[in-house]
Regions:
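Phosphate/oxyanion-binding active-site loops and adjacent basic polyanion-contact surfaces
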Residues: 218-228, 353-357, 411-437, 467-474, ...
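Glycine-rich phosphate-binding loop of actin/hexokinase-like ATP-binding domains
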Residues: 257-295, 532-536, 541-637
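Glycine-rich phosphate-binding loops at beta-strand->alpha-helix junctions
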Residues: 455-473, 585, 775-792
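Phosphate-binding glycine-rich/basic clefts of nucleotide- and phosphate-handling proteins
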Residues: 278-373, 594-734
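Early-domain small/polar-rich strand-loop-helix modules and first-structured segments
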Residues: 1-396, 622, 627, 632-636
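Phosphate/ATP-binding catalytic cores across multiple sugar-kinase/actin-like superfamilies
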Residues: 228-250, 421-450, 538-571, 723-774, ...
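Low-complexity, highly charged intrinsically disordered N-terminal segments
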Residues: 121-122, 127-216, 372-423, 430-520, ...
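Short helix/loop segment immediately N-terminal to the Walker
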Residues: 375-379, 436-453, 549-575, 639-677, ...
């Protein structure tokens, strides 16, 4: 039996991932036999399990009748020495049997399945309920192993008799739940008499899909569900859940965000009272994938968003009005958004543009105009056309342009401005952060695993020379997202009749909008730095060097790297100063900060920064990415053998094949919009850039510091998230050859050559400034700065 797992009450949706080994012997041992009879109380056919009677006559009887006659023990076993003469006998021709493990796995694989996780009492028996708080998803790895994800809606009820949501007792031993241990209760979990008809309706749809005619056995979906529950129980891998009270105090966690034009990264760190900060406890923000629930993405992620609601099963909302398993954000971001768009076929089939995604909301902080068309949820099924964005509990807070409404009259249309889209990104990030900090993994890692975590501060960095209006908009969106998520839980919990305090309304966004709004005459009243993207690396560098390399002794650091401050007014104590220049090359801007640091000799070390020069330049990683796509992927001259397969690869591959009018074809596919390029052509060009060109360019950039060339095929490049078939077919029809046939050479020298051509002038200007201010240390940050060619410049 797997150890029990712990979830904190009222900590939103919590996920637990584990592997389960399938035992072939369990299939035979857990077969389920049953009869179907019309039930007048339920007014439909219902089933009753049949079990074998002792003896050699191959006779069976209904378990329900045996229970009524007292022939079933308290443990659910048949009392074999009973007199069965009065029992109605059933032979093998009168009942049905299910027990095909592969078949039931095919029906349930990659679907969210409601699971009866019921409360245990002190004598290890189970009560019936709660009925709607745990669901299971699995994917088969091989014939003997499946990957499993459990998700629990941890919202609790204030009513101890509630059968839908869990109630948290003061006695911790009363808050242990496990998968239902007997078939009778499992059957009750699908029974309309227990208000669980929604489960049976959902399981029925998974089995019968679009079948219009049915024949006996009518209830094989229920029988297979019971068989599946038997398998889960017999494997012993489904853990018990211990639901911990959220009323024993909480621990603050801070979130630091660097929202980029193309990539975003975030870190979480605890501030447990009485403990000094430890960089080793910092965790990257992980994004739980909802489309592929077994995937969790801990790396930096794309800022692209797509409107798509997170669902945990297509349940009939008329039958299930519990309002459980609600995720507050209507957007997906990062890897999941990329995959959704790569797999999209609906736009082509609809032959119209579906306004469901945006490449980078941060680019449009100035655009507060309503969209000309309504935003729609992305659909991956042509039979389910896109619908306008409406998220219960969120849409009621918004004006039509996506801003927070100040009264109860909310907007009737989803024509959100591009500026407001960043608020939706924050909404998703904060929901993911709250999920992660209350996960069992995070709590166990940081200690005090029984205490709830809350977001306390959200620190958001920005480009060094970002204009004040955009700085305010960047942080204002975060403040609005916090407000929205607090209000959301107030609206949803009122419907659920639950008690919950998920998000702390005193969350601080740093720097605050109030701070940023101070004019030049009141800057001394500011509480916080603006945490620009060039200064942040300096702070981390100073902390790391002094604390770890110099054992916490700033004297050693300043004596080694610094110089005498001859401008000091204190002639007796001329402290040494260190001037640091930092260059951060991001996606949209390259930021420069030159700052002089001094410190005093008091008992408490105080290092004082004095900014000398700062600027942002609109030349950065996106410009390099564009040049790599243009020069390596699309068109370019092969002037020597070294350029082959890494210069104008598409153009030169076409010429080698003898394709006519190559330049015209390139212009027709990649050129500017014209009347000759229809909707499909424009869509395919966008899809090519997003699905093919950018991923390949990033692979080239990732190889920039490696030694030697690397030859890759199409399948090598796209081991995950391959381009859509429609896009590849369109490419072939346009150019006359398959894109998959192209061979690619990842050439570090070619990438570094392009990098030098893009940044040489800028680096020369920055180097002049660094020399002018006589910097003692120069810090390079950002992915591009790791390229050898840039260091050489």
């Amino acid at each position: 039996m797997r150890d029990a797992i712990t979830f904190i009450a009222n900590s939103g949706l919590q996920f637990y991932h584990f592997d389960m080994r399938l035992d072939s012997a369990a299939q035979k041992a857990n077969k389920f036999r049953y009869v179907e009879r019309f039930d007048s109380l339920r007014r439909k056919f219902w089933l009753d399990e049949v079990i074998a009677l002792p003896g050699d006559d191959d006779l069976y009887a209904r378990k329900g009748e045996l229970e009524q006659l007292g022939f079933i023990s308290a443990t659910g076993k048949l009392i074999t020495d009973s007199d069965f003469s009065a029992v109605e006998k059933i032979d093998e021709t009168e009942f049905f049997e299910v027990g095909n493990l592969n078949q039931v796995l095919r029906y349930f694989e990659k679907k969210w399945i409601p699971i009866p996780f019921f409360k245990k009492n002190n004598i290890s028996n189970q009560f019936f309920g709660p009925t709607d708080w745990v669901r299971l998803y699995f994917e088969r790895i091989n014939e003997t192993m499946i990957k499993v994800v459990l998700v629990a809606d941890t919202s609790t009820s204030a009513d101890p008799n509630d059968t839908v949501s869990p109630f948290v007792h003061e006695n911790p031993n009363e808050n242990i739940f496990s998968i239902c241990s007997d078939d009778k209760s499992v059957l009750g979990f699908l029974d309309s008499l227990n208000n669980c008809e929604w489960v049976e309706d959902y399981i029925s749809k998974l089995f019968y899909a679009r079948e219009t005619e049915m024949e006996q056995p009518f209830l094989r979906h229920i029988a297979n569900y019971i068989f599946f529950m038997r398998i889960l129980r017999s494997m012993g891998d489904v853990p018990q859940i211990h639901l911990l009270s959220d009323q024993v105090g909480f621990i603050d966690v801070d979130l630091v965000l660097d929202v980029g034009n193309s990539k975003t990264c975030a870190i979480l760190f605890e501030n447990a009272s009485g403990h000094s900060f430890n960089f080793n406890s910092v965790k990257k923000l992980s994004i739980q994938d909802f489309g592929n629930p077994h995937q969790v993405h801990p790396e930096s992620f794309s800022t692209r968003l797509v409107f798509k609601d997170a669902t945990f099963g297509a349940f009939n909302t008329e039958l299930n009005q519990n309002n459980k398993f609600q995720w507050p954000s209507p957007v997906r971001i990062g890897n999941e958004a990329e995959r959704i768009l790569n797999d999209s076929k609906v736009e082509l089939q609809l032959t119209r543009e579906v306004k469901s995604y945006n490449s980078s909301p941060k680019r449009y902080l100035w655009d507060n105009h309503e969209s000309s068309f309504e935003w729609e949820y992305h659909s991956d099924d042509i039979n389910i056309p896109p619908t306008r964005v409406y998220k219960k509990g969120i849409s009621e807070q918004l004006n039509s342009d996506g801003t927070l409404c100040l009264d109860s009259v909310f907007g009737s249309r989803s024509v959100f401005s591009r500026k407001s889209l960043l608020t939706f990104v924050y909404l998703e990030l904060f929901a993911q952060a709250f999920r992660q900090i209350n996960s069992m993994e995070f709590r166990s890692l940081h200690g005090n695993p029984s205490m709830k975590r809350k977001l306390r501060r959200i620190i958001i960095s920005c480009p060094t020379a970002m204009i004040k209006k955009e700085q305010i908009a960047l942080r204002q969106s975060a403040s609005q997202a916090i407000t929205m998520i607090n209000r959301y839980h107030g609206l949803i919990d009122a419907v659920q009749n639950t008690q919950i305090d998920v998000y702390d309304h005193t969350v601080e966004v740093i720097p605050s909008v109030k701070d940023l709004n101070l004019d030049l005459y009141n800057l001394d009243k500011r509480k916080d730095w603006i945490y620009d993207e060039a200064t942040a690396p300096q702070l981390v560098f100073l902390y790391g060097m002094i604390k770890h390399k110099f054992d916490g002794n700033p004297d050693l650091f300043f004596n080694l790297y610094g110089k005498q401050n001859n401008n000091s007014l204190d002639k007796k104590n001329k402290n040494r100063t260190v001037t640091i220049g930092s260059i951060d090359i991001g996606g949209g801007t390259s930021d420069l900060m030159i700052c002089r640091y001094s410190y005093n000799y008091d008992e408490i070390t105080q290092i004082t920064p004095e900014p000398l020069y700062w600027e942002s330049f609109n030349l950065a990683g996106d410009d390099l990415l564009k040049e790599i796509i243009q020069q390596i992927i699309i068109e370019g001259t092969v002037s020597n053998e070294q350029d082959r397969d890494c210069s104008g690869v598409i153009e030169n591959h076409a010429r080698q094949l003898g394709i006519p009018e190559v330049a015209k074809k390139l212009n027709g596919f990649f050129g500017k919009d014209s009347n000759n390029i229809g909707f499909k052509g424009k869509l395919m060009r966008i899809n090519f850039i997003n699905q093919i060109a950018i991923p390949i360019a990033l692979r080239y950039m990732g190889h920039a510091n490696k030694e030697g060339d690397l030859y890759l095929s199409f399948s090598d490049l796209f081991t995950t998230n391959p381009p859509g078939k429609e896009l590849l077919d369109y490419f072939e029809n346009h150019f006359g050859f398959r894109f998959e046939d192209i061979r690619w050479k990842l050439s570090p020298s070619k990438v570094n050559e392009i990098t030098q051509s893009v940044f040489s002038k800028l680096v020369g200007q920055i180097s002049g400034l660094v020399g002018l201010y006589n910097c003692d240390i120069v810090i390079l940050s950002g992915k591009i700065c790791s390229f050898q060619s840039l260091e050489n410049l």
